[in-house]
Amino acid sequence: MSNFNDLTDPTDLNDGHDVHDGGQLTEQALRRRHAARGRSATGRAEATCRYVGIPSDAAEVVPTGPASRAAHAVRLSVRALARLPESSPDPAADARCARNASAAAVVAAQMAREHGDTALSEAAFHAAMAASRAAGEAAGRDGMGRDEPLNAKADAAEAAAVAAAKRAGWI
């Protein structure tokens, strides 16, 4: 599993060095951006699982309960992110990878919400849901991983989800 403290803030990724003449980010730059958002969401999910006491070995191929579902979702996200470098950059696929990681973080957030049962836990859960929705929009048919406003919205929502998880004590 990854170390959440080593993750890059996804809002710091668009530094302008990887743009085409038309001002569009290159596919490699988009990959780095989506991968960073995916790593952040996966790290958030891992930290949340640790918070509620779900060990990484709780993952099951066919999950039978909430804990195994959360651990399995995290494991799949970690594997998908690790395999990104094996393929050519594909903004749509890379954005879907980040979306899936964000969805894994929602599964973990559901567990933490029930575990913490505080206003901060509720807010962190809703921030996780918002990050997942924004990641889905960035990866969806309208964004296909290339739409700058949708990517920026997803990056900001991920950063907000991290901040909310920290306030809730999940991270």
Task: Show which residues each predicted segment covers.
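Active-site beta-strand/loop architecture of penicillin-binding DD-peptidases
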Residues: D117
